[in-house]
Curated annotation (Swiss-Prot):
Interacts with host importins KPNA1, KPNA5 and KPNA6. Interacts with host STAT1. Keywords: Host cell membrane, Host membrane, Host-virus interaction, Inhibition of host innate immune response by virus, Interferon antiviral system evasion, Membrane, Viral immunoevasion, Virion. It is found in: Virion membrane; Host cell membrane; Host endomembrane system. It is a peripheral membrane protein. Belongs to the filoviridae membrane-associated protein VP24 family. It comes from Sudan ebolavirus (strain Human/Uganda/Gulu/2000) (SEBOV). GO terms for cellular component: host cell endomembrane system; host cell plasma membrane; membrane; virion membrane. This is Membrane-associated protein VP24. Prevents the establishment of cellular antiviral state by blocking the interferon-alpha/beta (IFN-alpha/beta) and IFN-gamma signaling pathways. Blocks the IFN-induced nuclear accumulation of host phosphorylated STAT1, by interacting with the STAT1-binding region of host importin alpha-1/KPNA1 protein, thereby inhibiting the latter. Without the activity of this protein, activated STAT1 would not enter the nucleus and be unable to activate IFN-induced genes. Plays a role in assembly of viral nucleocapsid and virion budding. One of its GO terms (molecular function) is structural molecule activity.
């Protein structure tokens, strides 16, 4: 008599690839409060987010600052002198950076459906909402996204963070200090500063920079300590740190 057995049961992908990414990891942005800020988990990556620099942004915005900071306010008038600009939380800044990392790989690689469509939806969710969960309704997307593809997505996010780490602090020498990503719906600008990354999201035409009639813009600051543990390149010497520092910047 034949007997049913489980001799050749496959090991589930999640158990086999503990360091891999499953689709639900991309659709869950988990935030846990800590003593100094928040711990964020997304796509198998963990970030420690703090509030450093946010009070300073607000003071620059309301013109409550030391005279030595005037240059910083004048350098970013569309942020600090614009009635339509809004200071956001560092959690928002992290979401924008992660969304920018997704959009960056969509532009760099010729991704086919359903992957490109799914990534666009996830990027929009990170950029336009503050919710912790995104419900991807299309089962076809879930079925066709392999563990390998999902792990590559995470690798490309880390590559984007590495790009940010190679930026120079805003300087007088014309060295690259910002990355910009444009879509039909918004323009993202991420700028390296002394404290970390100044993140801004504008209208696609960058109307916030119109001197006469500045348009709306949201901005925030993500302290550099948030991305350092994830980035691959590490500072090699104190010399590189001195070269990066710009004492003229308040942030």
């Amino acid at each position: 008599m034949a007997k049913a057995t489980g001799r050749y049961n496959l090991v589930t992908p999640k158990r086999e690839l503990e360091q891999g990414v499953v689709f639900s990891d991309l659709c869950n942005f988990l935030v846990t409060p800590t003593v100094q800020g928040w711990k964020v988990y997304w796509a198998g990556l963990e970030f420690d987010v703090n509030q450093k620099g946010i009070t300073l942004l607000n003071r620059l915005k309301v013109n409550d600052f030391a005279p030595a900071w005037a240059m910083t306010r004048n350098l970013f008038p569309h942020l600090f002198k614009n009635q339509q600009s809004e200071v956001q939380t560092p959690i928002w800044a992290l979401r924008v950076i992660l969304a920018a990392g997704i959009l960056d790989q969509l532009m760099d690689h010729s991704l086919i459906e359903p992957l490109s469509g799914a990534l666009n939806l996830i990027a929009d969710w990170l950029l336009t909402t503050s919710t912790n969960h995104f419900n991807m309704r299309t089962q076809r997307v879930k079925d066709q996204l392999s563990m390998r593809m999902l792990s590559l997505i995470r690798s490309n996010i880390i590559n984007f963070i590495n790009k940010l780490e190679t930026l120079h602090v805003v300087n007088y020498k014309g060295l690259l200090s910002s990355v910009e990503i444009g879509t039909p719906s918004y323009a993202i600008i991420i700028t390296r500063t002394n404290m970390g990354y100044l993140v801004e999201v504008q209208e696609p035409d960058k109307s916030a920079m119109d001197i006469r009639h500045p348009g709306p813009v949201k901005f925030s600051l993500l302290h550099e300590s948030t991305l350092k543990p994830v980035a691959t390149p590490k500072p090699s010497s104190i010399t590189s740190l001195i070269m990066e520092f710009n004492s003229s910047l308040a942030i």
